[in-house]
Every structure is written in structure tokens, then in C-alpha cells.
Amino acid sequence: MSASPAANTFGASAPPANMFDTVPGYEGTLAGGGGGYLPPPMPSVPMPVPEQAPHPPDWHIPSISEERAREAFATYVSSNCCYSSGPVTDGVITNMQSFNTYRYRLETFTESRSTEWSQEPYSGQPVDAGVQPAPGPWQIAAQPPPFFQDQKQAIKVPFTSSIKNCHVCLGMGNKPCTTCAGAGNKVCWVCNGSGSRLNDERCSHCNGQGRENCSSCSGNGSSQCDTCHGKRQLIVFINLNVKWSTEKEDFVAQDLSGLKVEKLEKVSGKELFKDSQFMVYPVMGFPDASVAQASQRIVRDHQTKFAQTSRILQQRQTIELIPVTKVNYTWKGNPYVYYVYGNEFEVNAEDYPATCCCSVM
């Protein structure tokens, strides 16, 4: 008689809560993470002294020439396969108006720390739990990358590692085969378990048994435990996950040109002001009041928000002047508009009049 499938008495894949020891300073640590970022200690560096933003002699960028506007327009049209060049060659420019668009940007480079219980097969690694108290999450040294370069690092917390029986295979090193449920055999796929073919001849594939050896476990009924890799034991420890990230926020002063603000996200401008230090102070004395107000709001928000769960390592604020030129032109007696913007001379022409249908063969 063939073996019946074995009942699944083995442990769940998720480790039980009592598998992990209580480590002072790490009481909220969970397996697999999810405990959130840990609040950092109070900063030891005092707040910087307010500095007034400098006043450059000229806040304005000269408007581009008509020839440069046409060149940018021609490049834009040639990059669109469904645009004909008629408006470029025959269009008549009737007016060009330049707008100075200021973009304020604050970047806050932070270090965040979280912990999680981790495990790996035990192969003789050092075990140090209880030898001495584990250092606190923010007492462990971690070398940060250069400022504003995002990076992650996992550090094994000293004096937290211990040995436990594998919770998945219950310390046996193997587990029932999931294909045959531990029986070592399964229903013959040729005769569907009947032992004979359609003409009542004995099934040659299973020799009339109606079952065949399981190919997944070679008939053993079990396979090596994927969690402990057959070692029967696990070494469990706390991992400190350190994350360095740059939090960025922009403000673009409205210039009344009509160009959508999101078009400016991927272009650059002329850098008018740059300030980088541990914690910056809001820009003061800038000619455009909306930029100064945005700086006050964003700096306050960043220092309040990120200081709760992260350590602020550096802040950098810049003000760029992004050139925007609105070009009015006529073609076949009708008025149209396009914009040339950024140091890259990008073009936006939403009402381009000479388009055709394209099809891909």
C-alpha cells in the first residue's frame, strides 16, 4: 500500500515572537523590520547664525535672440516625427517676451536608523549575546557617504547574536516535500492512478502501482530546509539598517508667462545663490518676496519634520534664475505661441499647428 501524505506538523515560515531574546534598548525591534525609524539624540552643534542672502548686481538675464529662438524651435520640431516644418520655415515672429523665473530648492541630507531581527544558518559563527550590553542604535559607528549621495548599510549589532533551533523544520534540517506532501510518491500522470491503460493493460510507467516516485524529492518524502540549509540551527541577531537619503523640495515663483511649472523640473538655470551648511537659515533680503517666504516655510518644515526620525547631516539651498521666453508668431494668418526655457533651450509648443497622423508598421 502506498504511503499517505504526511500531515504538516512543521513550523510556520514566520519566526515566533518568543524566538528572540529581549535586548535592552531594542525592545521594539521586529522580525523583518517594520518598527519605524528611531529618533536620534539631540544635535550637539548649535544652530547657525542668520546670514542675509547676497544681492547680485543684476537679477535679470538678457532675452535670447530671434535667431536662437528659431534654432530651438527647429530642433524641437525635428525631434517630433509627426510635426512638419512649415511653421518653422514660414512662421513670422511677432513678439518675444522674456520672463525671469526663480526656483528655490532646499536639500536636506539625513541619516535614518531602524532595526530588525535577522537570521541565517548557523555554521559556527561567533555567539556574543549577554557577553556585555549591546550598544544603542545611535552609538554604533557608521561611515556616511559624501553629502547628498544616497546610500544604505546594514550593520550587525554587537552582543545580540544567539543560537536557536530552526522554527521552520523544528530543528530537523529537512521538511516534507511540498510536491508529494511527504509521501515520497504521487499519482501516476499516465494512468491517473488506475494502474492500467485504456486497453486494460498494465501501465508501464508505474508498473501498475498507480503511483510513481516523486521527482522533486527523489522519493525521499523530504527536502532540505530552505531556512537553515540543513544546519538545523539558526543564529539570530539584530541588524541595524542605516539609510542616508536626500530630501528635496522646490518652489518656483510664478512668472505669469503661461508656461506650466512642471515643465521646468528637468531644466537648469543660472545659479544666483548657494548656501550649504549643517543647518541653513532661511534666505533673507531676496528681491522676490515669494521666494523668501517659501524659504522660511520649507526650511522650517524640513528641520521640524526630519529631525524627529533622522539626524540631519547637511542642508543645501540654492536659488536659480531660469530663463523663459514667450514667442508669439503667426503662420497662415493665425497666431500661435511657443516657449523657450532653461539653459538647455527646451521648447514647449502645445498648440503647434502642423501635425500629422503617424503609424508604426
UniProtKB/Swiss-Prot annotation:
Q: What is this protein called?
A: Protein SSUH2 homolog
The cellular location(s) given in this protein's UniProt record come to: Cytoplasm; Nucleus
Keyword vocabulary terms for this entry: Cytoplasm, Nucleus
Task: Please explain the role this protein plays, according to its UniProt record.
Answer: Plays a role in odontogenesis.
Where does the UniProt annotation place the signal sequence?
A: none
**Gene Ontology BP, a term:** odontogenesis
Q: Which GO terms describe its cellular component?
A: cytoplasm; nucleus
What changes when the gene is disrupted? Morpholino knockdown of the protein results in increased incidence of agomphosis (absence of teeth).
* Chief site of localization: cytoplasm
